């Protein structure tokens, strides 16, 4: 081994391969930096729209399409927001998949409804979603599509004595109905189904299928990984049901 080191160092072919590898690595780093710089205007505009107090713009050079998001442990890291839609019947299969590079779920329920109908040929009668999806505009749109929304009503920000389930003067009919509905025991019972479906899928994806950290880069490839998980999950569900 001791004699092999100087021989390898003097071998022109080995040196050429190493130089080529270093050059490729440098070129790839430059391309990632260029891609990150191209993302800055979009990230800046998103920060302005969200009213963020911190104007600092951060773009990942490892994956320029990822965005810095708050994690469950309280830290901030580049990430993607994976969205799944799951049925609440006995099958409990995934019928919708999407990936976005925003930490907020705002505005995602409407396109997911369209995707579910496109994939299954059926529009759901009810939609059980987390509070982040419950924007008034989304509730109005769901009502137009004759879909009943079940989502937590946020507590009043200023007047903590006000009943959040009582409609406000500027509420639309759909939003007012949603507030009243979520104050009933029946709605609360229905909403509990979400924990046994959506949260189960999310836990399986992160804890058992490795979707807590992707081995690919870019929205398109991450969506491919999420879709592959959904396919695998559905096959395993059908097997467990004797299908």
Give the role of each language-model region.
Residues 1-243:
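Anion-binding and metal-coordination hotspots
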